Amino acid sequence: MNPDEDTEWNDILRSKGILPEKEPDVDDVLDDALVDAKQLAHENRLENKDLDELAELEDEEDDEFLQMYRNKRMQEWKDQMSKAKFGSVYPISKPEYTAEVTDASKEVFVVVHMFQDSLPACKLLAAILERLAPMYPQIKFVKIPGKQAVENYPEAMMPTLLIYGHGDLQQQILTLATLGGMNTSVVDVAEALVRAGALKDSDIAALKDPQNAEDELGKRDSSVNDDLDDDFD
């Protein structure tokens, strides 16, 4: 009996531990590694493409692979939507902070806006977060007056943006100075969420499209101007 032969009897003996497992064929291992490497290269090339951009690549890519990758991206999107629980910016009070922020961040990322209504920068950030919340409903966005959250919290440190995840504070942003000041955009804040781990680069790819960025700028300016006008009514 040749223990290296691929026979049903040898397979039975191997399953019982009587014969050692057959050594993998070197050529087969190399072939598998090559296939994996090619697929990884394809996926890396396509990673940040949205569904419309994938459609534009149909002439360049293998149809079967492209359809498989499109299905994968669609499933990722569905999985993300299935995790959606929020979609708005929710007001919280100091007694609720531990449960609504620290404890909640063990399951999802939580973004906290500490604000003061009279500050234009706080109005700007509030308008941006109101845009982002429905776009990323898997993230919990909350707001709390700064002086309610921390007694005598200085105006000079507001707005403050706190990003929690995995049960702990991941990033703290004091004022809009590091984001762009009064020119801070939706993309600037979204990129901060990426740096904190709350989003992936691919999640904000559509936001970075020049046309989308222009649209968002118009919506942001309109919202902020409305808030500022209210102050003089």
Swiss-Prot record:
Cited Pfam families: Phosducin (PF02114)
One Gene Ontology biological process: protein folding
Name listed for the protein in its UniProt record: Phosducin-like protein C2A9.09
Chain intervals with Acidic residues compositional bias: 224-233
Domain Phosducin: residue ranges: 58-212
Keyword rRNA-binding: no
CDD domains hit by this protein: Phd_like_VIAF
Family: Belongs to the phosducin family.
InterPro entries: Phosducin-like_chap/apop_reg, Phosducin_thioredoxin-like_dom, Thioredoxin-like_sf
Thioredoxin fold as annotated region, ranges: 86-233
Residues the record lists as Phosphoserine modifications: 222-223
Residue ranges, annotated region (Disordered): 207-233
UniProtKB keywords: Phosphoprotein
Domain of life: Eukaryota
